[in-house]
């Protein structure tokens, strides 16, 4: 287990063995955030914000998250209305399950649905791509016409969550590579992006 002292007002990156935590930390620091890495559930729960990164196979990311009780920390944060951001496979594991190479792995189940392989002639989808964001998206405010960097072969390709008043509808942002897929979801305190 690892834990770097949480600086007051900071963001914790859940450290469960994912390969891109240092690049994520650097990006957040360049944006002015105070960043700490931790595999401790209590530290992840107490942070101002929690980042769930993810690189590699859905099953490996879930095994890593489960090994540090990350799912419980995420659930506790969301129950309390505290922000969580999932990136790449960190977004994918927020769905009910993922199917990769015939293996069906349970996810965290924050959203219904399955992550499957893109129906595209060239995989992985690697490079810059545009997105189709809602006009009132907070995440894409002022940058909706920009291009975003993707590296993936799997994604959530449909949205099945039905939300009824008085609850707000999640903001869904889509992209396309062979087939249409979710590029980002803004859902109360839970936000996730497929791009890096």
Residue positions per predicted region:
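Pocket-forming structural segment of enzyme catalytic cores
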Residues: 96-175
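Cysteine-nucleophile active-site neighborhood
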Residues: 55-128
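Extreme N-terminal starter segment of soluble prokaryotic enzymes
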Residues: 6-12
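An anion/phosphate-binding loop that grips the pyrophosphate of nucleotide cofactors and donors
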Residues: 47
